A protein has these predicted regions:
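Short proline/glycine-enriched turn/loop motifs at strand-loop junctions of beta-rich domains
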Residues: 47-52, 111
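Beta-sandwich interaction modules
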Residues: 26-37, 69-122
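Intrinsically disordered, low-complexity peptide-like regions
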Residues: 4, 9-11, 16, 65-68, ...
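Structural beta-strand segments of beta-rich domains
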Residues: 38-42
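Transition segment at domain starts
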Residues: 1-36
Length: 122
């Protein structure tokens, strides 16, 4: 049963000029509250999306750039496939991941389309 739900990104449609990633604002993970259930679920809502999105975590209470790491199994997209098609109807993808992460954030490289939202709960 989820306890908390957080919004990581919303209405992103600025396209990247290169292969570098942009980052959303950090949000608390299960480890922040010292919860015993480290299961998280991320839901990605995209529309005509071409790019890459992944979730990053950290075990540091006051993280620096080098403290963040990619959470395995959370990546969608590969910079070459349009996800969500060319329709006006957004498409949802979900990924489960476990860990007592203190902070969670979204990393993204948007080549085209829209990231409608990325939400996660634990």
């Amino acid at each position: 049963m989820s306890i908390e739900s957080h919004l990581l990104l919303e209405n992103i449609n600025a396209e990247a000029v290169d292969a570098s990633f942009s980052y959303g604002t950090k949000q608390p993970g299960a480890g922040y509250y010292r919860l015993n259930n480290p299961l998280h679920t991320a839901v990605y809502t995209v529309n005509a999306f071409n790019g890459t999105i992944k979730i990053q975590g950290t075990l540091a209470m006051y993280p620096r750039d080098i403290d963040w790491f990619d959470i395995e199994g959370t990546t969608i997209g590969d910079d070459s496939t349009i996800m969500g098609g060319e329709t006006v109807t957004p498409v949802l993808f979900s990924r489960n991941f476990t860990g007592n992460f203190i902070w969670i954030r979204a990393a993204y490289n948007l080549q085209d389309g829209t990231i409608v939202s990325i939400r996660y709960n634990y």
